[in-house]
């Protein structure tokens, strides 16, 4: 995709903090690697609602799975993070229909399985400082 190669260098200058809400550790570690390689600071990886609310703190954005260790709590976690901290939300799920009413600051959804370019495009979309964020066919804008 033209222009996709410039996303990491733009992101790298920003050092935004990210919370990863994902109960599949290999998926979470893949997200962490992609985001950290692009210059983001991953604040934490959490696997359920209790961990998310006790660990979250003020983060700039969150990548949130829908079905977690404690059930389909992702949408509620996303709403809480958006309301309490103003976090921009990117849902990461195999079934976007389960999102229901998106969180106030939800910007998009990425279908699993995902690729690195989709994650970087979604991160740029979730960053209010990215005026020229590049879209990606695997990112569903909300």
Where are these regions (language model features)?
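Non-catalytic signal-transmission and effector/linker regions of two-component phosphorelay proteins
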Residues: 1-17, 111, 115-142
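Acidic, metal-coordinating helix/loop segments flanking the phosphotransfer/catalytic sites
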Residues: 2, 45-61, 69
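Conserved acidic carboxylate
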Residues: 22, 93
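Two-component/phosphorelay signaling modules centered on CheY-like receiver
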Residues: 25-44
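Conserved phosphotransfer microenvironments
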Residues: 64-82
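His-Asp phosphorelay/catalytic-motif detector in bacterial-type signaling
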Residues: 84-90
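As written
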Residues: 101-111
């Amino acid at each position: 995709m033209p222009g996709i190669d410039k996303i990491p260098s733009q992101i790298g200058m920003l050092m935004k903090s990210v919370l990863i809400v994902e109960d599949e550790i290999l998926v979470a570690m893949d997200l962490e690697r992609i985001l950290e390689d692009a210059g983001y600071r991953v604040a934490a990886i959490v696997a359920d609602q209790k961990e998310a609310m006790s660990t979250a703190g003020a983060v700039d954005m969150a990548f949130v799975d829908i079905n977690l260790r404690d059930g389909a709590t992702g949408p509620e976690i996303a709403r809480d993070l958006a309301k309490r901290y103003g976090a921009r939300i990117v849902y990461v799920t195999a079934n976007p229909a389960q999102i229901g009413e998106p969180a106030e600051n939800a910007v998009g959804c990425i279908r699993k399985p995902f690729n690195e370019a989709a994650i970087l495009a979604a991160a740029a979309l979730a960053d209010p400082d990215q005026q020229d964020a590049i879209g990606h066919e695997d990112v569903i804008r909300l």
